[in-house]
């Protein structure tokens, strides 16, 4: 039943991609008349985690100063925003696991953005998949919200933009991109990095840079591609990693039927890279990619938090295994 549901969703989002051009005024007018997933700043919540405080309490723009870190005059942590996608939440197991991996790795301040209302998560199970276009239309607004929080961090807590990184999955990747555009508009500078985990394809993949996540949205934009229907194979970033060629991830079953598994696998790959249980090595894309065993630091790039320390940019093929930690490099680290 679950696979049938996502097969129907696949058919739906393909229809939406061709019937509703993102940013089309006629679509905007229709969404204004009836929006089952309305955006409001009041419905966006934040979970704020540090090594010292891992409580999953929700905060808003009005209550954020009740958190201990925001009672200080300066925040010295590296900051990571994590943003979920369509019909998901900040409390989904995959995102909490990512946050935990970050805190195990370094002394981060992790802010999970929960925009479940505008992402249509609260709608009836049999109906909400039809509301994708409404959630897609809310991504820029959620991006503006993240930019507002960023402005607070920079201007009130002396956090350098170089200390702020955004991670977003699916629609959350485009939301992160819109945040990157907004902070530049506010003259705050650029984020250190934006990491797009299988950015949503429907409604976005044929759009110009201004209407989706783009390589100019941060100093470094890392894209991890894992599905070609719910996601996209279009190059979007400073580096684009095509895991198993960007679709049909090992262990996810048949094409299309396993599309949702492939789409969410991007989150799991990135989390494993944070844990450094292995280095998922990207080799430059070509008709005949070189073996991982012959990679050097100047030729290839490891997926993850350290990707931007490698000199090479562009598109990379990344071989993966079907089970965590997903390595296909026999322990090689470059």
Curated annotation (Swiss-Prot):
The active site is at 170 (nucleophile), 198 (charge relay system), 263 (charge relay system). GO terms for molecular function: phospholipase A1 activity. Not glycosylated. Its EC number is 3.1.1.32. Loses its activity after heat treatment. It is found in: Secreted. PROSITE patterns: LIPASE_SER (PS00120). It catalyses: a 1,2-diacyl-sn-glycero-3-phosphocholine + H2O = a 2-acyl-sn-glycero-3-phosphocholine + a fatty acid + H(+). Disulfide bonds join 37-120, 209-214, 252-261, 278-302, 279-327, 295-300. Residues 24-33 form a propeptide. Residues 1-23 form the signal peptide. Keywords: Allergen, Cytolysis, Disulfide bond, Hemolysis, Hydrolase, Lipid degradation, Lipid metabolism, Secreted, Signal. GO terms for cellular component: extracellular space. Gene3D superfamilies: alpha/beta hydrolase. Expressed by the venom gland. Pfam families: Lipase (PF00151). GO terms for biological process: killing of cells of another organism; lipid catabolic process. Catalyzes the hydrolysis of phosphatidylcholine with phospholipase A1 activity (6.3 U/ml). May act as an allergen and induce hemolytic activity. PANTHER family: LIPASE, LIPASE MEMBER H-A-LIKE PROTEIN. Belongs to the AB hydrolase superfamily. Lipase family. This is Phospholipase A1 2. It comes from Vespa affinis (Lesser banded hornet).
